[in-house]
Amino acid sequence: MSLLEITGLTHSFGENLLYKNAGFTLNKGEHIGIVGQNGTGKSTLIKICTEQIIPDSGRVIRQPNITIGYLDQYAEIDHTLTMKEFLKSAFAKLFEIEIQVMQLYEKAADGDMKNLELAAYYQEQLETHDFYSIDTAIERVANGLGLLAIGLDRPIIEMSGGQRAKVILAKLLLEKPDVLLLDEPTNFLDKNHVAWLAEYLSSLENAF
């Protein structure tokens, strides 16, 4: 099934023609890479896919309701957070469901079966999405990218630019979007971390 498709893409940057009637299709679970010299339009293509740039002509077709994750290493981060707090925000929707579950169980304390059944349904959703293994998932990714040694309780404001870029990458990996768009993800990674990332991505079921 096609998750993302570009057809008839033509786009220029100033007088430099980057794409002429180009296209590609990204299917479910498919892993593709785009290589080229600096200035050939790799980053531009990703921004076209994420609708940050409108192409001169062509169509970008996305499956409805899919999630697309884009690696922006220079995104603004809330500096009041610790690394762990920021990484936990990758699971914000699950934490919202947890609050709903607790509220429903409170309402069901008087024997309301409707609220009890609803709470059980949401509880199952949490278990399906490995909610109770979040800390383990965070430690695995943080360790793979060399962040665990820094300390998960380290405030973001105390981290270097390279460390923050790795934290942004870690959060994106934890979010597990349907489509993962990575623009030079090995920036700031040493050899061991690059090897870990390659192995992690090769085992990923989602498309990137």
Predicted regions and their residues:
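ABC ATP-binding cassette signature C-motif
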Residues: M1-F208
